[in-house]
């Protein structure tokens, strides 16, 4: 990257974008941890551990269905409609959803069906906002500043994932409706900052093209670009198998016995590692051997998830038990679990950084929305469908067996991808072949 590239925070529109994403991420993370805890607690009133864990998987599936059905369309929308207004509309939906959950909790009438409906609303909002958010960032900064913009944008997301779960767990311990009330306020703040983003360049109009053809072009582009295909599918299968976050309420309540506060810390663990890595990349952008570093990072991610899964039996086998020394509660299994999640988060951030940089820099702006939609579809499949997979496997193997299976599976998948896609290992830098640009990449739109 050129040394003269301006830092993204020097650009007013990007600052507003960053603050909007930061506020929204804290709110989403706080609500996700509270919803997961409430679903598991309500389910445990009438179900055993395996059955309740399956309900956590179903929450992930409820979010995946609208994402799966809508994402191909939302990519086209992101390439056809002002991306700022897409995010404004979806954030309004999130404000309404958080406010409704606050009311139901306050009234004492919150039920599992209501929580599942909230998960569906989350899925709809994310289906539209994901491609719009991703495709908007390159319009706010010069091309040479984009890798740094991706890194600092990831900081907003990762710091939000640190603060959100911790805040959500602590506020839930005070009272559940307090957590939902704060989430509603934070979504409103995110909406205000999105309205502060001024005019930005829009993709060129393509009214002469049939919508179905334009939708399929996004999938065709990904299929033909093997490097982009490799990065997207590696994340899909690795996280699909090793996504253990949906089972954190099970670990917090029935394995580690640390309650909602401990759940908040566990959920923040991956964010801590990811945020530290993103901060490093914002000052020291990766520039060499990017493909090999991504492959190594995903292997480390799988091994870290495996370590998290076996932390409790390993510490028990070593004779390390929970005890209080000098007024400090020492919980070896919890500490090892936290350390493993921090490492997993840092490794995952390396993968995210490489994947997003390659996708954004290897895609012309007129197609970024559709390609970002394809990327989001795979991300949602790996995350939400991965939650469902974790719930199903936990109902069969138990929660520990499900996490161990996922960690081993992610490692094996990465080794296989290194052989199937030699283009990924051969990628030395982010620099793409010459891409035909059809519009300016940054600056203010002319009135």
Task: Describe each region flagged by the PLM.
Residues 118-159:
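Cytoplasmic helix-loop-helix junction between adjacent transmembrane helices
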Residues 1-15, 200-233, 324-328, 437-446:
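Juxtamembrane intracellular "pre-TM" segments in multi-pass secondary transporters
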Residues 2-65, 220-270:
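Helix-loop boundary and gating motifs at the non-cytosolic
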Residues 125, 129, 185-203, 416-421:
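C-terminal membrane-cytosol helix-exit motif in multi-pass small-molecule transporters
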Residues 57-62, 69, 73, 80, ...:
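C-terminal transmembrane bundle of multi-pass solute transporters/carriers
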Residues 33, 158-169, 246, 278, ...:
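Glycine/proline-centered helix-kink
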Residues 24, 63, 122, 153-160, ...:
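Structural signature of transmembrane alpha-helices in multi-pass secondary transporters
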Residues 107-114, 157-194:
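Helix-loop-helix hairpin linking two adjacent transmembrane segments in secondary transporters
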């Amino acid at each position: 990257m050129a040394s003269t590239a301006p830092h993204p925070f020097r650009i007013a529109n990007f600052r507003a974008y960053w603050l909007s994403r930061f506020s929204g991420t804290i709110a989403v993370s706080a609500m996700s941890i509270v919803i997961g805890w409430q679903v598991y607690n309500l389910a445990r009133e009438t179900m055993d551990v395996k059955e309740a864990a399956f309900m956590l998987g179903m929450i992930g599936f409820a979010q995946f269905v609208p994402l799966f059905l809508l994402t191909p369309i939302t990519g086209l929308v992101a390439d056809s409609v002002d991306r700022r207004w897409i995010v404004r509309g979806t954030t309004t939906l999130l404000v309404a959803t958080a406010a409704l959950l606050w009311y139901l909790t306050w009234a004492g009438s919150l039920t599992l069906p209501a929580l599942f409906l909230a998960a569906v609303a989350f899925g709809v909002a994310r289906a539209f906002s994901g491609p719009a958010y991703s495709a908007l960032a390159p319009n706010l900064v010069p091309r040479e500043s984009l890798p740094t913009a991706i890194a600092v944008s990831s900081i907003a997301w990762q710091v939000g994932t640190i603060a959100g779960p911790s805040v959500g767990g602590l506020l839930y311990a005070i009272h559940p409706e307090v957590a939902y009330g704060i989430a509603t306020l934070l979504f409103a703040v995110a909406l205000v900052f999105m309205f502060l983003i001024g005019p930005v360049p829009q993709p060129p109009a393509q009214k002469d093209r049939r919508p179905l053809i334009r939708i399929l072009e996004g999938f065709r582009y990904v299929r033909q670009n093997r490097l982009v295909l490799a990065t997207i599918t590696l994340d899909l299968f690795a996280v699909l198998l090793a996504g253990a976050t949906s089972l954190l309420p099970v670990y917090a309540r029935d394995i580690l016995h640390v309650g909602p506060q401990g759940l908040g810390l566990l959920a923040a663990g991956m964010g801590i590692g990811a945020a530290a890595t993103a901060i490093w990349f914002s000052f020291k952008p990766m520039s060499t051997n990017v493909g090999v570093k991504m492959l190594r990072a995903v292997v480390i991610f799988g091994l870290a998830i495996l370590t998290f899964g076996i932390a409790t039996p390993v510490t028990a086998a070593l004779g390390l038990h929970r005890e209080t020394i000098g007024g400090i509660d020492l919980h070896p299994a919890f500490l090892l679990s936290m350390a493993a999640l921090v490492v997993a988060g840092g490794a995952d951030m390396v993968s995210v950084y490489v994947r997003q940089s390659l996708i954004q820099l290897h895609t012309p702006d007129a197609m970024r929305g559709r390609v970002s939609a394809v990327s989001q579809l795979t991300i949602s499949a790996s995350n939400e469908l991965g939650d469902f997979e974790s719930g199903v496997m936990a109902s069969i193997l138990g929660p520990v067996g499900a996490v161990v299976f996922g960690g081993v599976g992610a490692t094996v998948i990465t080794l296989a991808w290194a052989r199937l896609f030699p283009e990924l290992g051969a990628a030395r830098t982010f620099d793409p072949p010459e891409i035909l640009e059809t519009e300016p990449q940054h600056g203010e739109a002319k009135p």
